[in-house]
Amino acid sequence: MREILHIQGGQCGNQIGAKFWEVICDEHGVDNTGKYNGDSDLQLERINVYYNEASGGRYVPRAVLMDLEPGTMDSVRSGPFGQIFRPDNFVFGQSGAGNNWAKGHYTEGAELIDSVLDVVRKEAENCDCLQGFQVCHSLGGGTGSGMGTLLISKIREEYPDRMMLTFSVFPSPKVSDTVVEPYNATLSVHQLVENADECMVLDNEALYDICFRTLKLATPTFGDLNHLISATMSGVTCCLRFPGQLNSDLRKLAVNLIPFPRLHFFMVGFAPLTSRGSQQYRALTVPELTQQMWDAKNMMCAADPRHGRYLTACAMFRGKMSTKEVDEQMINVQNKNSSYFVEWIPNNVKSSVCDIPPKGLKMASTFIGNSTSIQEMFRRVSEQFTAMFRRKAFLHWYTGEGMDEMEFTEAESDMNDLVAEYQQYQDATADDEYEEGEEEEEEAA
């Protein structure tokens, strides 16, 4: 019932995805051979959201793994949970996308896409009532961004009424892996605006800061960063996998978070923040969780919610707690910080409560916010894009794969439109509407 099909693409996506499955297996008591050895019936009650039950009582993730080069897949396969995946669900090429969006989207990726779609179809047919897809990828490289968005648009064509949720790692402001990141990211956002329902925006730099400042890790590795992401990913779907008092699913989430269809880029946070291996020893209270969850330092993308306003937000609590207390805390947050919420959407914070906490914690919470301040990220990428595109730097790598300059111009203006839309709603007040009507009448006169 209500299955979610997980897809991971490119190096970043596969590494995040591998971590995610470690967390999910742990929560459901599935070991790295797919055998169940948990201690509670609740772990099995809705295990089929993320797993197929195979012969011999093994649980196999509903996961499709794709990449344009074999390297990362090999390391996933030889990793701790590598043997749990279905071998047919690894789909990879040999050539690599070389950080080139056009290779991922038009040439190399397009050659591989049909084999990926075959696997997706096969997995979807195994589902009772498929709820939607979750895609892990980065927007800075070639495969996750180019081929990832190609796959998303193909799935959109074939399953138009299913939810499409992405976990997208944006290029960081200061830490850059490749020079052409702004190109790849802008071309990807252009696709995500059209074809995804909900995008959880992540950012390595913000994750580094959390590891460094809050978790006091001197030299955070990608493993530590992905550990944070996977905690959030697990939190977003816990309501589907465990019984709860206030449930939410991907569609309820979308209905409550997206006031305008294009504005579906969310910042995410998690509390309590703990480093790998060391769980905090003091039990947290709901007010403490709430405070940490809304803290700007806790956001996993490099945008500061204090620079904008929340259109909507959603708080998912896990553990044994009173729903009344949760509701009081949420109302409390809105009352104390009312200037940070748009006043023309009353009660714009939704909360849900799931009874089962993550492994090793008494209670935890996941935060998803639709804040206008996310425009900072788009704006930053857009500036870098324009700086290079003005000089047509590196463009030949893309046109050589059959792309047209027009596409770049379109993607650029789409990104700028998105920024303008966020700005427009940030500035809007509750009584704007009728004034606009009057102005139009005056102009007509």
From Swiss-Prot:
Binding site residues for GTP: Q11, E69, S138, G142, T143, G144, N204, N226
Cofactor requirement: Mg(2+)
One annotated GO molecular function: GTP binding
Annotated region (Disordered), positions in chain: 420-445
Amino acid composition bias (Acidic residues), ranges on this chain: 429-445
Keyword Transferase applies: no
The protein's name: Tubulin beta-5 chain
Assembly mode: Dimer of alpha and beta chains. A typical microtubule is a hollow water-filled tube with an outer diameter of 25 nm and an inner diameter of 15 nM. Alpha-beta heterodimers associate head-to-tail to form protofilaments running lengthwise along the microtubule wall with the beta-tubulin subunit facing the microtubule plus end conferring a structural polarity. Microtubules usually have 13 protofilaments but different protofilament numbers can be found in some organisms and specialized cells.
Function statement: Tubulin is the major constituent of microtubules, a cylinder consisting of laterally associated linear protofilaments composed of alpha- and beta-tubulin heterodimers. Microtubules grow by the addition of GTP-tubulin dimers to the microtubule end, where a stabilizing cap forms. Below the cap, tubulin dimers are in GDP-bound state, owing to GTPase activity of alpha-tubulin.
PANTHER family: TUBULIN
